Design a protein with these regions (language model features):
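Outer-membrane beta-barrel porins/channels
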Residues: 1-304
């Protein structure tokens, strides 16, 4: 049986600066903390047989640094193109990982051992870039690309050496690089408001949105080197933003956001029975609803 628990939390402090009109610079610093526990138990129906339990755990406490830029190129009085990019610093995470192995009979723990990996984790270097076309206050079309270099990060995992005619099988708990894949994501979308200041039609003041993305996961199920394909995911979404107040203004009014998203995941793995590649596929829908009471709540602080 398998079960697990845990997760990460993050607090972010960000600041932006516009040294001159077309260019803005930004910087984010964040603190990450959390933990995880993964339990694996192998038991047998015979009361005289010993069971084995393994508990993998760690506590994480580290920082994250990100810098970015934005360049605005006006086309005319109402239209413009915005180009942006970010870089996230990869670094060592100086936290340890633990593996506890227990051998149990029906009532007590017979043996117990703990393996420790010092400085077992790394965060990846990451870059992202995007371009957006603005047509007045009515239309936005954008494309984004993101790359995270997880293949260069070390991560704890159990390593097993298969027995040969001269050496018995063995296993160890190590933090090694190359166990994860680089993560990439390509996204595109648009939103359109027919007429933000329309007095004659409510639906002309609504904003209609749609988008799609394709992502290759950092997860790596190819433990034997025999799986050719990589895990991937793609999805499409659509939504509408409904202004609540019937006013002659567009900004700083309450809104209701409704959206639906369809997601497909494709995870190849090695079938233990046939020793051939199999694929785990999932399709699911997400329905989201959100309320913005007043956009003034989200005004950014400015340092004079």
């Amino acid at each position: 049986s398998f079960n697990g628990d845990g997760g990460l939390r993050e607090v972010i402090l960000g600041m932006g600066w516009r040294p001159f009109k077309p260019i803005s610079l930004g910087f984010n610093a964040s603190y990450l903390w959390g933990d995880y526990t993964h339990n694996m138990t192998m038991s047998f129906s015979e009361s005289t047989a010993f069971s084995m339990a393994r508990i993998y755990s760690a506590e994480i406490s580290t920082y994250n640094l990100q810098a970015g830029f934005q360049f605005i190129q006006p086309i005319n009085k109402t239209d413009k193109i915005v180009i942006g990019g970010t870089y996230t610093l990869g670094h060592d995470v100086n936290n340890d990982a633990y593996r506890k192995t227990e051998t149990l009979n029906s009532a007590t723990i017979e043996t117990e051992s703990i393996d420790t990996i010092r400085n077992a984790f790394q965060l990846p270097h990451a870059i992202a870039a995007g371009i957006t076309y603005y047509r007045s206050d009515r239309l936005r079309i954008g494309v984004d690309f993101e790359l995270q270099k997880w293949s260069e990060c070390k991560f704890p995992n159990q390593q097993t050496a298969i027995s040969t005619s001269t050496t018995p099988s063995s296993e160890s708990y190590q933090a090694l690089k190359g166990q994860l894949n680089d993560r990439t994501k390509l996204s595109a979308g648009f939103d359109w408001t027919p007429n933000p200041l329309s007095l004659g039609s409510y639906f002309n003041r609504c904003t209609y949105k749609a988008g799609a993305y394709y992502s290759k996961s950092y997860a790596n199920a190819d433990v034997t080197g025999t799986i050719k394909d990589k895990p991937y995911e793609f999805g499409v979404s659509a939504g509408i933003t409904l202004p609540v107040a019937n006013k002659n203004i567009w900004y700083n009014i309450p809104r209701i956001n409704l959206s639906v998203q369809w997601v497909h995941t494709n995870i190849p793995y090695l079938n233990a029975a046939t020793l051939r590649q199999s694929v785990l596929k999932e399709n699911y829908l997400r329905f989201c609803i959100g309320v913005t009471f007043s956009e003034r709540w989200f005004d950014k602080w400015k340092v004079q």
